[in-house]
Design a protein with these regions (language model features):
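Eukaryotic scaffold repeat domains enriched in small/polar residues
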Residues: 27-338
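Sec/Tat signal peptide C-region and signal peptidase I cleavage site
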Residues: 22-26
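Bacterial N-terminal signal peptides that target proteins for export
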Residues: 1-12, 20-21
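Enrichment for repetitive, rod-forming helical segments
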Residues: 13-14, 233
Length: 338
């Protein structure tokens, strides 16, 4: 795990302007240059505690970091363990120190996947083993459950390994569904299905593993179409608007818009699983890709041997109000970019 790198802070230059050649996205052209550094020793867990893989991360309205961990549970290739994880799976962390402020979710989830925190501080979670989508209060009280526990399906009452949730200002929400299905569903705030779209394939509005969903300020729905190696854009009615595709973008696992007032304002950050074998650090070329609104690749960081202190394999990401970037994957990391 590269112990020599754990004792140092690695850095990389990140350019926040479109580049002439997207394949060379790590090389500067003109404009302001940022340096991204992973914060060593973050997060800070209690003695004897371990994260395991962290599948989701978000920043809540109070500025705390909320993480969804698997706590040692492994996703085997041929089956999913349906036994609830005994340890707390949702951790609320101090953004500065990385200390755990509170933890909940013990005995409730079998294979954590997506995590979103809405403007009211509610926590939305998906479990790909249980085929369910949940809404919790900030303190862990369950407010809404969608899907039949452990039962996959394609109708309005079932999911097949749902991967993520995006919540609109009006309280309605979108679900990416997922590993078994190839669709996006739009629900009213009370859980009524409003519409859905998508099927399997590589054409516009078709998907090969819908791995995440996000909403843009202009009213567009952004979908991480992982195995088609692209991000698709739709209007709120599900009509195809366009796509992001580039030699510099591999498999998009998740994406988040840059908050106003941060260096990332107006840009998108994409958790890129790279190409080749996701579990082969030497081949995957995984990292975080910075994308302009028009789809131009601006930069990339969080790469092993460049600015990540240990293997990371980004699976999800979030941006704090101060511009700090939190990357979840094999572990949880914090990057400061200035």
């Amino acid at each position: 795990m590269l112990p020599s790198l754990r004792r140092a802070v690695c850095s990389a230059a990140v350019l926040l302007v479109p580049l002439a050649a997207p394949r060379l996205a790590a090389q500067p052209a003109a404009g302001a240059l940022l340096t991204c550094r992973e914060v060593p020793g973050w997060p800070r867990l209690a003695a004897g505690d371990t994260l395991g893989m962290v599948s989701g991360v978000a920043v809540d309205p109070a500025g705390h970091v909320v993480a969804f961990r698997r706590a040692g549970r492994r996703w085997e290739s041929d089956t999913l363990d349906m036994t609830p994880i005994a340890r707390p799976t949702v951790l609320v962390l101090d953004a500065g120190s990385g200390a755990v402020l509170r933890a909940w979710g013990a005995g409730q989830f079998a294979m954590p996947h997506g995590l979103t925190v809405d403007r009211a501080g509610n926590v939305w979670l998906t479990d790909v083993a249980l085929n369910q989508v949940y809404k919790f209060s900030a303190t862990g009280q369950r407010l809404l459950t969608l899907g039949e526990r452990g039962v996959p399906g394609r109708d309005a009452a079932h999911f097949d390994m749902p991967t993520g949730v995006a919540v609109a200002e009006d309280g309605s929400f979108y679900v990416s569904d997922g590993y078994g299905n190839a669709r996006v569903l739009h629900f009213a705030a009370d859980g009524r299905l409003l519409r859905q779209w998508g099927d399997s394939g590589a054409g516009p509005g078709q998907f090969r593993l819908v791995h995440g969903v996000a909403l843009g300020p202009e009213g567009r729905v952004y979908v991480a179409d992982r195995e088609n190696e692209r991000v698709q854009l739709f209007d709120t009615a599900g009509r195809f608007v366009g796509e992001w595709r580039s030699d510099a973008l591999g498999k998009p696992f998740a994406l988040v818009g840059g908050p106003a007032g941060t260096p990332w304002a107006g840009a998108w950050l994409v958790a890129d699983g790279g190409r080749g074998d996701y579990f082969d650090d030497a081949r995957a070329r995984s990292g975080v890709v910075v994308v302009a609104p028009d789809g131009a690749i601006r930069a990339r960081f969080a790469e092993l041997g460049r600015d990540a202190l240990a293997p990371l394999r980004p699976h999800a990401l979030a941006v704090g109000g101060d511009g700090a970037v939190y990357v979840a994957g094999l572990r949880l990391a914090k990057f400061i970019c200035r």
